[in-house]
Amino acid sequence: MPFNGEKQCVSEDQQSDSESSRFAEGVASLSDYECSRQSFTSDSSSKSSSPASTSPPRGLMFDDVMAAAKNLSDMTLAHEIAVNENFQLKQNALPENSLAGQVKRVVHQAFWDVLEADLSAEPPQYEYAIKLFEEIREILLSFLTPGGNRLHSQICEVLDIDLIRQQAEHSAVDIQGLANYVITTMGKICAPVRDEDIRELKATTNIVEMLRQIFRVLDLMRMDMMNFVIRNIRPHIQHHLVEYERNKFQEVVEETPNALSQTTEWLKESIDKELLSETDVAPAAEHSSTPSLSPLLVLNNCYLKLLQWDYQKKVLPETLMTDGPRLQELSEKLNQLKMTACVALITNNMVGAVTEGLPELANRLKRISAVLLEGMNKETFNLKEALHSIGVQTCAEVNKALEERGSPTLNAEVQANLVGQLSSLEEKDNPVCTLMDKRIQLYMKGLLCLPSTQKSMPPVPGGLDVIQRELEVLGCQYANIVNLNKQVYGPFYANIFRKLLFRDEAVGKIDASLPTN
């Protein structure tokens, strides 16, 4: 199963094995670790999301809310690990100028100042230092495999807290020796990427700073350990993802009233649109006892709406929360590709005759568009200005190519017309943009309707040849997301279709039309 946007698209009839207890426990432990630390995050910037209701309805117990949140957390984490090959835990430093960051620095500095004062006192006070070594011992032991081994016994022997307390009573604790042993042990069990940190620790001369840096590196080592676990369990999670995610979501639905409200509304919009369309085409169908809708067609139309979704203002259906960041990124890339295709179409229509036979020029113009349209989905981006710049540079490149061939350059009127038409692409309902939108939607719809046995890509509609390679890559990523979503949530969609259509005789057709595994 390609989970990270490979060229091969996921087919809808892909099977999933049953959930195993080892997998569930592994995901739960990862989720618990992530919640308890609260300092790690995913590099894909995925946010934990909950169903649309912002406050629990009356009668919903707090325990139910927490249970649903736990299931959502486990499900989201498992999904992210499975579909995102780059997923890893990483330290999330507080903003330097934030209140929380300042409070943290002040409190930590106060602790280390007290420790330094205690160790410098006559006689030295070891209470805080002993607590630190006790915590260090537990962290080191957590890196080792369960069961007895020589290193485990050695750590317990050297960092024997009872013995250290006895030594402290006689002011005979070798703090430097204990710290050196800890650093040596860390060097034996850390990942190679931490070797430089270990060398820096060994070069530190101030004992308090050394202890401070030991904890910093131990935190990094714990992060490395969790990422190692994630890499190793990823194939297992991928193998069981469909069944596991479906079962977890079922628990959320059972624990949370109206857990599918946004999903129901999402499907209802497409059903109403299809029914209205059928009535317009064949008014007699209005009196038919059974809707002639294809649930799979309606569902595909729902997925297509996600390509033009307002991710800043509209809430996603609950069944798509885990893929929200991926869908938003895909939609933004597709929007930029559409604008590139629009620019190429207008340019070709206006000056194509004089630039025919210059493929390198077409590639240069495409690169110019890609560079100047970078970041066009940001609110601060000035699209009109970018399109004007593209028009000016396009004219310059075309004139340069014509001069090299000894041909007349574009006159001022043609150049002004070209720049003006390109600048008008930012206007709402621009006919060229509308046309390209329809063709991209047609291409994506064709991808979703591909038989599972077909491995080749559908033909690219006219005008999209300039972005064919990029469109195929995004199309496969989109199809992978959609087909996995159908496998996981097919039974939930079928139940919603039943309720919306109120047709008992249609139930069998609906069940047969939607993938459930």
From Swiss-Prot:
Stretches with biased composition (Low complexity): 36-55
Positions of the UniProt region annotated as Disordered: 1-59
Protein name as catalogued: T-complex protein 11-like protein 2
Compartments, record wording: Cytoplasm, Cytoskeleton
Domain of life per record: Eukaryota
Keyword Cytoplasm belongs to the record: yes
This protein's GO CC annotations: cytoplasm; cytoskeleton
Subunit structure: Interacts with FMNL2; this interaction promotes muscle-derived satellite cell (MDSC) migration and differentiation.
Phosphoserine PTM positions: 16
Gene Ontology BP annotations: muscle cell migration
PANTHER family according to UniProt: T-COMPLEX PROTEIN 11-LIKE PROTEIN 2, TESTIS-SPECIFIC PROTEIN PBS13 T-COMPLEX 11
Chain coiled-coil ranges: none
UniProt family annotation: Belongs to the TCP11 family.
Entry annotated with the keyword RNA-binding: no
Key words, A-Z: Cytoplasm, Cytoskeleton, Phosphoprotein
Function of the molecule: Promotes the migration of muscle-derived satellite cells (MDSCs) during differentiation throught interaction with FMNL2 and therefore may participate in microfilament assembly.
